[in-house]
Amino acid sequence: VLGNGDTVFIRPLTPDDRPTLAEFHRRQSADSIYRRFFSPKPELSDKELLHFTDVDMVDRAALAVESHDELIAWASYERWPGRSEAEAAFMVDDGHQGAGIATLLLEHLAAIARSNGIERFTAEVLGDNRAMLAVFAKAGWPLQRRFDSGVVDLDWELADTDEFLDSVERREQRADSRAVTRILLPRAVAVIGASERPGSVGDAIWRNVANSVDVPIHAVNPRHDEIHGHLSCRTIDQLPDEVSLAIIAVPARDLDETVDACITKRMRGAVIVTSVDGSDVDVPALVTRARRNGLRIIGPSSMGIASPRPETRLQAALVDVALPPGGVAISMQSGSLGGSFLRKARDVDLGVSWFVSLGDKSDISANDLLQFWEQDDNTTVIAMYTESFGNPRKFARIA
C-alpha cells in the first residue's frame, strides 16, 4: 500500500521481463533516464536488459512494481565484491513519481539485502535530484554523504534504528488511513445489484443509500433502466468514471465477474454485502486480483458502512437505524451483533462518527480502521468487535 492509498504489486524481476523493461525505459523522459544512468540512454541494450533481470536475489536483486499489470517502477541492488555492502538504484515511471513508490522499494530491498548478510547500502545520486535525495534522507537511517563533481555519494547502515522504525510506522499509518479514506469518503457511489424487489438486499441497500448520501449515486441492475425513480445502468462499464466506491449486492455466482468489472472501471473501493458461504468463490484469489489493481475490499458478508455526521453523511448499510452524530466509531465483524449494537446505540442516544461492518475481513482489517480513526478529528472513542487478528502485533502497536 502506497502513502496515497493506492495498492501496487511488488515482485522480483526475471529474464522474461526484458521486453517489458525495455518498453518501460523507452517511455521515460530524457531527464528521468539521465538521473538514473547519469548519461543519455534512449534504449537499454540486450546485455543491460539481461544484467538487470537475471538476478539471484542474494548478491544481486531486482524488484518490479506493477499497477494494473503495468510496470511502473523497478529497483535493484548489487553487492560490492567481497564486501557486506551493496549499491542500490531506483527508477520510477514519470507518471507515478511522488507517490512513495521509491520509499516502499527501498524498504523491500533493504529487507532482502539484510536477509542475505548485506549490512550497508551505497547510492550515487545527482546533486539536483532532490526527490531521490529526500527519499533516502527520510528513510530513517543516518546517512554519510560525500559530494564529488555534481554527484552525492551516500552510504548508510541497514540497521533498525528508532528513526527507521518510526519512518516505517508513519508510512504505514498514512497508507492504511488513506486506503480507508477512499472507501469511507467516496467521490461517487454505485450500488451494484440495486433492486426494487421488496425485502431484497439490493432494495434495502439502495433505499438507504439514496436517502442519505450527499455525493452522486448510481444504480446497476442488468434488467432495469430505472430503480425507484433513479436511472439505472445495465452494466458496470456504463457508469461514469467518477464512481470510486461500489456497494456490491449480487449473487455469489456473479461476484468474480462484478469485481473484475469494478477493477476495469478503476474503482478504488468495494463493500461486498454478498455472502460467499457455500459458494465456489475463491475469496483470497479475488482479493489478490483486486489489490493488484488498486481496488480495496470490505467484506464479503459485510452489513455495510455508515456515517450520520453531516459532513460525511452516508448510510450504505443493511440496518436502517437513525443514529445521532457523535464521536464513537464502531467496527463489527459479526453482522447480527452489529445490528444489535446500532439499535442499542440509538436507544441510548449514543453519538456515532462511523459504523463499519468488516464481515469476512478479507482485505480491509481492524488495523486499517484504527489507522484511519487515529487521525479522524470527529472520532474520540472506538468500539470494536473482532473475532480474529490477522496481525496481532500491529494491532497492539496501533491500539
Give a label for each model feature.
Residues 1-182:
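Long, contiguous binding/interaction regions
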Residues 163-399:
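Catalytic-core regions of core metabolic enzymes
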